[in-house]
């Protein structure tokens, strides 16, 4: 970037004499303030005032003439609370941070206060571009693990990192399963003793030493999403909702066994390459299995075209919930005061009506928590706050995770 004051006869580089950045309004921009510059404008009424755009937002200065004195130009971020993002994953712990997010381009954040910028900035060591998976050990809440793709050039950095203080500080794993391992999904045993990572288009890999070594999980197909039981650290689960197959492990993820399910998903969509597109957005929360916080082997399958629940201890006997017709996103939240079962949140069609819904009685009844004016476009995920009943977070395409307080609904 150059500046001229004589009609283009001579030019002075703006950044060669030094510069200062004020990141205070958006600390996450510190990782890469200058990139994707598309435009610069000088205030026609004030030659000291200029602005330029980047992929992380707009920057502004009021001392542009410092270049002439060979002094630093000070730039301040303009994007206070406004940013185009794609949230890819949400994790709400029972203690500590209210929410830990995985986001496209910016990596992700540990949110202690959703009303203010995260003072820690985006997750570091390493910085991810995309964080496709983030979760934690339910019985060891300080342990959180994330997987994604690296941001920029970070020699020797790994695409998996973990925190042992609830997302404040991060440690890179020593190794990855293969040279190309990145993105995908991560599952962490309830006590944190074992992790299962399924990188993009890859087999599932198990580590029991925080990524120092890896082994292939036996009995799983490639590219399938695995979750951990929230109580028993030996149990992991995965589901292929369209093929009606449940995979389960009782040895900490080393071996999985397949069980045939009797679901009622639309058979016309099976075996068709285009079916995945018609079954909602692949980045969304449908056609997944979920484990209920605080309850062993209490499982939900949020299929695109139906909701199924199993609490049978001896076998996996899923029953369909007859009111739910379509699901785009599904999640849990803190139980209503006086209840012992977590609140359930769902985005989809119930009783013929599209909306955002909450159930306080294990999906026997539902309350709509939005209205026709507040639909928000494409919503990929929904996640209840596990520390405050009635607060819920939704992932909107091209926005940050959006909190909504709906306890009075």
What residue spans do the PLM features occupy?
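Conserved Ser/Thr-centered positions that define the repeating blades of beta-propeller domains
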Residues: 4-5, 61, 108-111, 162-164, ...
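Beta-propeller fold detector
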Residues: 12-18, 70-77, 120-122, 171-175, ...
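Surface-exposed loop and turn segments in beta-propeller and other repeat-based domains
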Residues: 15-31, 261-279
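Signature of short aromatic-glycine-proline-rich micro-motifs recurring in repeat-based ectodomains
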Residues: 27-41, 87, 130-133, 276-289, ...
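Loop/turn-rich, solvent-exposed surfaces of beta-rich toroidal or solenoidal domains
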Residues: 36-45, 294-295, 302-304, 321-360
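Short glycine/acidic-enriched loop and turn motifs that connect beta-strands
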Residues: 58-59, 107, 150-154, 243-245, ...
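Conserved blade-ending motifs and adjacent loop-strand segments that build the rim/top face
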Residues: 79-87, 128-129, 322-331, 366-384
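Conserved small/polar residues in nucleotide/adenosyl-binding loops
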Residues: 398-405
């Amino acid at each position: 970037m150059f500046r001229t004051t004589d009609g283009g006869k001579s030019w002075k580089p703006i950044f060669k004499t030094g510069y200062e950045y004020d990141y205070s309004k958006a600390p996450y921009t510190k990782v890469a303030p200058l990139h994707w510059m598309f435009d610069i404008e000088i205030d026609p009424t004030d030659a000291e005032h200029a602005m330029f755009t980047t992929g992380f937002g707009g920057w502004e200065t009021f001392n542009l003439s410092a270049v002439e004195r060979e002094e630093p130009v000070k730039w301040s971020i303009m994007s206070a609370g406004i940013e185009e993002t794609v949230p890819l994953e949400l994790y709400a712990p029972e203690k500590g941070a209210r929410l830990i997010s995985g986001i496209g381009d910016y990596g992700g954040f540990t949110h202690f206060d959703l009303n203010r910028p995260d003072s820690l900035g985006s997750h570091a060591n390493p910085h991810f571009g995309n964080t496709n998976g983030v979760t934690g050990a339910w019985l060891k809440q300080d342990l959180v693990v994330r997987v994604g793709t690296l941001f920029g050039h970070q020699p020797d950095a790994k695409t998996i990192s973990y925190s042992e203080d609830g997302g404040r500080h991060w440690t890179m794993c020593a190794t990855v399963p293969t040279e190309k391992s990145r993105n995908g999904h991560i599952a962490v045993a309830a006590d944190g003793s074992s992790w299962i990572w399924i990188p993009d288009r890859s087999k599932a890999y198990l580590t029991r030493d925080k990524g120092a070594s890896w082994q292939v999980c036996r009995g799983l197909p490639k590219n399938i999403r695995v979750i951990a039981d929230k109580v028993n650290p030996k149990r992991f689960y995965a589901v292929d909702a369209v093929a009606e197959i449940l995979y389960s492990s009782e040895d900490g993820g080393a071996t999985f066994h397949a069980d045939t399910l009797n679901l009622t998903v639309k058979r016309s969509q099976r075996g068709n390459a285009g079916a995945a597109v018609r079954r909602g957005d692949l980045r969304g929360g449908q056609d997944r299995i979920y484990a209920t916080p605080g309850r062993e082997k209490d499982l939900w399958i949020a299929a695109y075209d139906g909701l199924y629940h199993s609490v049978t201890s001896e076998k996996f006997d899923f029953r369909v919930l007859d009111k739910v017709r379509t699901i785009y996103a599904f999640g849990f939240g803190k139980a209503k005061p006086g209840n012992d079962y977590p609140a359930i949140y769902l985005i989809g069609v119930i009783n013929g009506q599209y909306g955002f819904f909450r159930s306080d009685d294990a999906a026997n009844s539902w309350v709509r928590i939005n209205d026709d004016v507040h639909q928000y476009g494409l919503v990929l995920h929904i996640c209840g706050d596990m520390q405050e009943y009635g607060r819920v977070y939704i992932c909107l395409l091209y926005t940050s995770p959006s909190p909504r307080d709906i306890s009075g609904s």
